[in-house]
Design a protein with these regions (language model features):
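Hydrophobic helical membrane-anchoring modules
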Residues: 1-4, 168-169, 192-265
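Acidic helix N-cap motif at the loop->helix transition within catalytic regions
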Residues: 16-20, 52-61
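Short beta-strand/loop segment that forms part of the nucleotide-sugar
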Residues: 33-49, 82
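A conserved acidic beta->alpha catalytic loop
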Residues: 47-56, 112
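Acceptor/aglycone-binding surface of glycosyltransferases and processive sugar-polymer synthases
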Residues: 78, 84-99, 116-198, 225-235, ...
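Short aromatic/hydrophobic "clamp" motif used to bind/position activated sugar donors
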Residues: 105
């Protein structure tokens, strides 16, 4: 098993949901069966320029470590905080994944829509893959409990079809906010990331395919959580469509990674 795990949680105005989500995460980290997760972990909240008390909430946690993002024992985990100007989820995830510590690096939604007990699935997949993509729509093991509005679900399906045809190929669920990377792959891919909107996941997957990284699709459980600010609006739909078109052009010069760096840490 990989010897350490870094967890990145992007957060924007999550004051109302983050405390309970962190309770859930730390409870699992401390109680997970031996062998399910590495014994060394780091947890990093990236505050994406929140205008509420998100950052203050993180600093008030008993696990908060002012010294930064260092690894600690899983039975006594520490919590780090990185504050960045508001740039959207893609920018926040990128900032965290470029500094987080761990042989395996995972980013997850701050509301724990994918429960922490799914972390072990990504870590195990990264034993043989460079990139592990959580999927909510796999017939063999995922459980998606959605209460999203019908229109949002319809837009999501249309987006998945367009992304598959134009960019991601066999990857159906590009937008699951639960993805894992070996450290070398994370530093490479996030360093090259050009799309910072909600389409950043598609950009990552396209880059991973262009760079020749080994990808695993991992069925995970997922439940829609109240409080999401994501709304399907015409202006957003146009931005998404434009970013999908851009992806294949902004990375035209990207070449395959040397095999020794594609998963050899």
């Amino acid at each position: 098993m990989l010897s350490s795990l870094g967890i990145v949680l992007p957060a924007y105005n999550e004051e109302s949901r983050l405390w309970s989500a962190l309770d859930e995460l730390f409870e699992y980290l401390c109680s997970a069966p031996s062998g399910d997760l590495p014994e060394l972990v780091s947890v990093l909240v990236v505050d994406d320029g929140s205008t509420d008390g998100t950052a203050a909430l993180v600093r008030a946690r008993p696990e908060f470590a002012a010294e930064g993002f260092a690894l600690s024992r899983r039975d006594c985990p520490k919590l780090g905080l990185l504050t960045v100007p508001h740039g959207g989820k893609g920018s926040a995830v990128r900032a965290g994944m470029l500094v987080a510590d761990g042989d395996a690096l995972v980013f997850a939604d701050a509301d724990m829509a994918t429960p922490p007990d799914q972390l072990g699935k990504l870590v195990r997949a990264l034993e043989t893959a460079d990139v592990a993509l959580g999927s909510r729509i796999q017939p063999d093991g995922s459980d998606m409990r959605a209460t999203q509005p019908r229109f949002r679900r319809l837009v999501g399906r249309m987006f998945r079809v367009a992304a598959q045809l134009w960019v991601t190929g066999p990857v159906k669920d590009t937008q699951c906010g639960f993805k894992g990377f070996r450290r070398a792959a994370a530093r490479d891919l996030f360093g090259r990331l050009r799309i910072r909107s909600i389409v950043f996941d598609v950009d990552l997957i396209y880059l991973a395919r262009r760079r020749g990284y080994r990808m695993a699709i991992v069925p995970v459980n997922w439940a829609d959580r109240r409080g999401s600010r994501m709304r399907a609006r015409p202006k957003l739909a146009l931005r998404v469509a434009w970013d999908l078109v851009r992806i294949r052009f902004v990375h035209r010069g990207v070449k395959r990674a040397p095999r020794e760096s594609a998963a050899a840490e």
